[in-house]
Design a protein with these regions (language model features):
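Conserved N-terminal beta-strand and adjoining loop/helix that marks the start
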Residues: 1-20
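Short coil/loop residues immediately preceding or within conserved phosphate-binding loops
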Residues: 7-9, 30, 80
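Short, well-ordered beta-strand micro-motif
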Residues: 14, 84-88, 106
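Conserved Nudix-box catalytic region and its N-terminal flanking loop in Nudix hydrolases
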Residues: 19-55, 141-148
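Active-site-adjacent beta-strand/loop module that shapes the phosphate/pyrophosphate-binding cleft
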Residues: 73-93, 122-124, 130
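NUDIX/MutT-family hydrolases
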Residues: 95-127, 145-148
Length: 148
């Protein structure tokens, strides 16, 4: 089969020197500290979607987000793709939203926080140039992942 149903979302690492914007997500299905982001609306460009989601969740207006990797997996005959972006270009005042509390955090301190599931290894895709994919796969009934 050459066609599969696909759902697109995004995450963005907003950098200011050694600090990054994080959100303590309140959603029960994926709670914990992560980067801001969300769903791509039908017909919306990927870049416009990450700019919109970041502004909705943080109050910051980002510019020039650069695609730096993906997270993907297949489940229930659908593929889920999370587009990873990063940027150093932003303006505005940081503010929390109904999605969760947001703040600037030193990137070196992230492993000490209560991160979202597998966020510590996802961070490697954002920061290591030789990695571009965080791929979940099933082995029997167990979910595993590979960094590629």
């Amino acid at each position: 089969m050459r066609v599969e149903k696909t759902e697109f979302t995004n995450m963005c690492m907003i950098c200011d020197g050694s600090r990054v914007v994080v959100i303590d997500r309140k959603k029960q299905d994926w709670s914990g500290v992560t980067f801001p982001g969300g769903h791509v609306k039908p017909g919306e460009s990927f870049t416009d979607a990450v700019i919109r989601e970041v502004q909705e969740e943080t109050g910051l207006k980002i510019r020039s987000p650069q695609l730096c990797g993906i997270k993907d997996w297949c489940e229930d005959q659908r593929r889920f793709v999370v587009l990873f972006y990063k940027t150093t270009h932003f303006e505005g005042e940081l503010r929390s939203s109904s999605e969760g509390e947001v703040w600037w955090e030193d990137i070196a301190n992230l492993p000490n926080l209560k991160l979202s599931l597998d966020m510590n290894d996802m961070l490697r895709v954002f920061t290591e140039e030789d990695l571009s994919e965080f791929f979940y796969y099933q082995e029997g009934s167990e979910w595993k992942y590979a960094l590629k």
